[in-house]
Amino acid sequence: MALLQISEPGMSAAPHRHRLAAGIDLGTTNSLVATVRSGSAACLPDADGRVTLPSVVRYLENGGIEVGKTALSAQKTDPLNTVSSAKRLIGRTLADLHQNTHYLPYRFGDNQRFIELHTRQGVKTPVEVSAEILKTLKLRAEETLGGDLVGVVITVPAYFDDAQRQATKDAARLAGLNVLRLLNEPTAAAIAYGLDNASEGTFVVYDLGGGTFDVSVLQLTKGLFEVKATGGNSALGGDDFDHRLFCYLLEQNRLSQLNEQDSQLLLSLVRAAKEQLTTQTEARIQATLSDGMAIDTSISRAEFHNLTQHLVMKTLEPVKQALKDAGVGKNEVKGVVMVGGSTRMPHVQQAVATFFGQTPLNNLNPDEVVALGAAIQANVLAGNKADGEWLLLDVTPLSLGLETYGGLAEKIIPRNSTIPTARAQDFTTFKDGQTAMTIHVVQGERELVSDCRSLAKFTLRGIPPMAAGAARIRVTFQIDADGLLSVSAQEQSTGVQAQIEVKPSYGLDDDTITQMLKDSMGNAAEDMAARARAEAVVEAESLTDAVNAALELDSDLLDAEEFAQIQRDIADLQGRLKDGKAEDIRAAVAKLSRSTDNFAAKRMNRNIQRALTGQSVDNI
């Protein structure tokens, strides 16, 4: 019988039993990682005490990679190899960017399926750029927490489509992260506010980040977070305010085309001016371009507001639609939660306050609130806290359907459907003798397929030849908790079936991702061996401490040979701790455990006798 071991409260005897989880806000401008410690969520700082990590990656000549502040500082001088705002590019194509590529200081490839960025280290995709940011946050979390993360919750804009969500998960895979859940950013903010403040009622989350805008209408009741409606624009954010000020600067100085270095220089300066106008009434932009031209332009807060007021008003249209979808009037909204660094702009706050007739909530840092909510959710999903205390009901932001005859889009799952969910609908053949059917999966609100986003196609074969309209094909759509889609089609009379897990053709196929994982995980085997040994060492030390403590108390229960055998086994185990392999250490642990079985039984009998001494039968 092995010695019974009870660890001290709050202590974990083995690293594999200690479940470390984190929430990650993968942002356009800045990214953060947070975790729950001692019952409360907190963002984790870097070595310099900064919790925000600039979402900037630089590729160096020597093959190295810089991420964060050091990369940001080189953006002006090395724009072609320094990538920022990758979140605006992830899961998108060149066609999605429309006319906005001209002010982005990158060399885009001509691939039509996904975006390519040419750097000195070769072609990079937004997925790979995002993976470097996630790797840095992973390292920060694991160094701070002193162990490996079992999983993370990564936040995404509520209006991210299937391609953008899948691309985000692929970036996490490249970074070596286990994604417990993709969580909509407004929902994460609601979790942070709801749990911190025990709020109840109807709330609106207004989330204006660096590259995206989301709005969600939520009903918060005790223990329930229900998203009633969501909306937004995944291509509207603080970057657009920068772009408008950038264009104004060009107009004022009669400039047209700039090289990449000058473009990056002016973009960084207008971004700084925008931030300055948050607290000051005037900002001055001064620069010398590569051709020697001097720029010296002042702009007042009022001028900046006039230049960008149309962008602010553009955010209110999805707000109105979300309220309409939720069946909620402005006067029924108990509070408006402001999320995202761009909500610091005074005219944004004023517009929201005027629209709702109330001062928005800002008692949590708008830069941190999303990461905090993600950390709380990660803590639950990792099993560190029972999720019976609260229930999260999220929704899908866009309708999902398929193409029917005539290029029409038939909606299967309407937008604002609570997820996870599954819906089925029956379809039939169009021609006599038709034996196959192509299922074209689309996403969007428009009636025509040409106006919706194509997600995937697959073919159901083996349909029995019948008259047109006689066959019955049941198509089932399933959305998981991450908002990712799978579709199946089954002919009802024969049971023949086809299905697909929708992986949009934004770029990286499984083989490519697998190869990237192999390239980035060259030391994975060594890492696993080291972890296995560390776990074995912890187990060995725990057993040795327990045996030594027992010997101090009850060694008189052993005869000389038993005592000597236990001592020899302890010495053997300690000797293997120095340089033994995991399997050698575990073998020695098993041997010591066997040699102490009889000792453990004798100790238990003694303790039972002590407990019963002086007790009558009636008291037992």
Curated annotation (Swiss-Prot):
One of its GO terms (molecular function) is ATP hydrolysis activity. This is Chaperone protein HscA homolog. Belongs to the heat shock protein 70 family. Chaperone involved in the maturation of iron-sulfur cluster-containing proteins. Has a low intrinsic ATPase activity which is markedly stimulated by HscB. CDD domains: ASKHA_NBD_HSP70_HscA. Keywords: ATP-binding, Chaperone, Nucleotide-binding. GO terms for biological process: iron-sulfur cluster assembly. Transmembrane segments: none annotated. The keyword Nucleotide-binding applies. The keyword ATP-binding applies. The gene is hscA. Signal peptide: none annotated.
